[in-house]
């Protein structure tokens, strides 16, 4: 029977009992921590849909709990309000009694009362007693009401804490649900594999800790057994000595027994009998000590056998856990490979789409030239930056004569409005296509250098920046960077020609002479 995932904590799946669940991509969810053979069963893996469904179930359960807690909070608030009203009513009643008594006692006496002080004191005494009797019952009721109110207040605070914790867990569950919904199928598979690997590693760590504890106990028990063995050897030697002395005295008693009835010669017999009895007691005590030591030794030996059996079982569990880790690692590697292949496919599709766009906008010839530049950049080393700059400047001067300043400023206006998140997306796609690592942060430097050209007219800082990156990461990175500029911004025909000219200057200067023809300039 499969174990359902109730929730995730720190990336590790747990069931509704709080136990870690190990889910192999080619096996069943397993919350028991046992099993063998590396979990190579033929049942289906936990799919991303199941993970997503679990997240939704967890959110729904928390919302249900939240509603139940809200109902309990409402009931507690009503109980508290009722207790408070009861307490306040009793408090007011008690105040009324006291005020009535004080009003009665504060009445000014008549002349006759002044003449009869004894009668007045009696009335006051009777009034005080009545007041005490009248107050006693409401005071007890008020104390009970106050206790009920405090209990209701305590319960209200406890429910508030429960609600706050449920709200926190609900937010985490909702965030997890949203995050899972945003993942691709391959990315979810990677996440499942990562969580399964983490769970398997956690299980192995627990087993290793258990084995270490058992080994410590085994070492201690063996030490105790050795000590008891030495003690037993000593006790047996003492028993043998006591037995020998007893036998010696027993033989003497037997030898002297014929004289036992002779008053003149019976004394040696009775002395030997007394000594034999004492030696018998000593021998019995030594036997008890030997028996007790043997019992302890047997207990320790039994404990050692139990520990050794537990270690054997733990080692079997460890072998299973290691096998699961290997399977989880293999599954993770497979999932990561599938994800990478999917990303590369997406990148290739995006790149092909990019070339198709180039074909539609600038013709097949330009698209073909762009592909040739990309292919030539693979593994190519940077050429002399001054030579590249000189070749580019020559091409640029010819190009500038064909375009107005407004046309030339289009590239600067486009880069000033660039959205770096779009650029980063294209940069990542082209980088995967050429199998290199792309960093959009480097693009900020390039954009900054290009924007400065509008004011300075100096292209050398840009070429030095590109040269440095080409030296560090290869010419392919320059291609990736500039292709992402072409894909992510609208540069105008002059901008397209300039970017292409930069690429040709670094990769193939001979193509500088064909750019205008290819673009139809």
Swiss-Prot record:
One of its GO terms (biological process) is defense response to Gram-negative bacterium. Residues 30-42 have a biased composition (Gly residues). GO terms for cellular component: plasma membrane. It comes from the Bacteria. It is found in: Cell membrane. Residues 146-163 have a biased composition (Basic and acidic residues). Signal peptide: none annotated. The chain crosses the membrane at residues 470-486, 493-509. Residues 133-145 have a biased composition (Basic residues). InterPro entries: Channel_colicin_C (IPR000293), Channel_colicin_C_sf (IPR038283). Residues 26-52, 127-163 are annotated as: Disordered. It is a multi-pass membrane protein. GO terms for molecular function: pore-forming activity. Keywords: Antibiotic, Antimicrobial, Bacteriocin, Cell membrane, Membrane, Plasmid, Transmembrane, Transmembrane helix. This colicin is a channel-forming colicin. This class of transmembrane toxins depolarize the cytoplasmic membrane, leading to dissipation of cellular energy. Colicins are polypeptide toxins produced by and active against E.coli and closely related bacteria. Belongs to the channel forming colicin family. This is Colicin-E1*. It comes from Shigella sonnei.
């Amino acid at each position: 029977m499969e174990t359902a995932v109730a929730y995730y904590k720190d990336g590790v799946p747990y069931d509704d009992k709080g136990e870690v669940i190990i889910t192999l991509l080619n096996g069943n969810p397993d919350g028991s921590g046992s099993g063998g053979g590396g979990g190579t069963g033929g049942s289906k893996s936990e799919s991303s849909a199941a993970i997503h469904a679990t997240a939704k179930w967890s959110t729904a359960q928390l919302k249900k709990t939240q509603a139940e807690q809200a109902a309990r909070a409402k009931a507690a608030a009503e109980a508290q309000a009722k207790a408070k009203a009861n307490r306040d009513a009793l408090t007011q009643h008690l105040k009324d009694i006291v005020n009535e008594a004080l009003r009665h006692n504060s009445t000014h006496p008549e002349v006759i009362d002044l003449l009869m002080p004894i009668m007045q004191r009696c009335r006051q005494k009777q009034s005080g007693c009545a007041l005490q009797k009248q107050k006693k019952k409401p005071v007890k009721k008020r104390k009970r009401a106050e206790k009920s109110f405090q209990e209701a207040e305590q319960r209200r605070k406890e429910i508030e804490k429960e609600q706050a914790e449920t709200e926190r867990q609900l937010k985490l569950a909702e965030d997890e649900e949203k995050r899972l919904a945003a993942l691709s199928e391959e990315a979810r598979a990677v996440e499942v594999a990562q969580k399964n690997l983490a769970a398997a590693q956690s299980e192995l760590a627990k087993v290793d800790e258990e084995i270490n504890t058992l080994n410590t106990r085994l070492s201690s028990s063996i030490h105790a057994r050795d000590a008891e063995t030495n003690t037993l050897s000593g006790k047996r030697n003492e028993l043998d000595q006591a037995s020998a002395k007893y036998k010696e005295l027993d033989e003497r008693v037997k030898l002297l027994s014929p004289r036992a009835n002779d008053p003149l010669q019976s004394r040696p017999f009775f002395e030997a009998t007394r000594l034999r009895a004492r030696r018998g007691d000593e021998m019995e005590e030594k036997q008890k000590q030997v028996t007790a030591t043997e019992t302890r030794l047997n207990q320790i030996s039994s404990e050692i056998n139990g520990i050794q059996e537990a270690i054997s079982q733990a080692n079997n569990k460890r072998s299973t856990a290691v096998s699961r880790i290997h399977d989880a690692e293999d599954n993770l590697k497979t999932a990561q490979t599938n994800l990478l292949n999917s990303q590369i496919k997406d990148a290739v599709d995006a790149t092909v789409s990019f070339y198709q766009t180039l074909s539609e906008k600038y013709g097949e010839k330009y698209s073909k030239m762009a592909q040739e530049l990309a292919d030539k950049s693979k593994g190519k080393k940077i050429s002399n930056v001054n030579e590249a700059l000189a070749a580019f400047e020559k091409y640029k001067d010819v190009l500038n004569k064909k375009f107005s300043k407004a046309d030339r400023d289009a590239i600067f206006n486009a880069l000033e409005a660039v959205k770096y998140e779009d650029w980063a997306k294209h940069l990542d796609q082209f980088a995967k296509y050429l199998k290199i690592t792309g960093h959009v942060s480097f693009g900020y430097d390039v954009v900054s250098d290009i924007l400065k050209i509008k004011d300075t007219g100096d292209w050398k800082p840009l070429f030095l920046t590109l040269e440095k990156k080409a030296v560090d990461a290869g010419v392919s990175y320059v291609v990736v960077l500039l292709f992402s500029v072409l894909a992510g911004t609208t540069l105008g025909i002059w901008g397209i020609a300039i970017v292409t000219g930069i690429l040709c200057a670094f990769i193939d200067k001979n193509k500088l002479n064909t750019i205008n023809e290819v673009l139809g300039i």
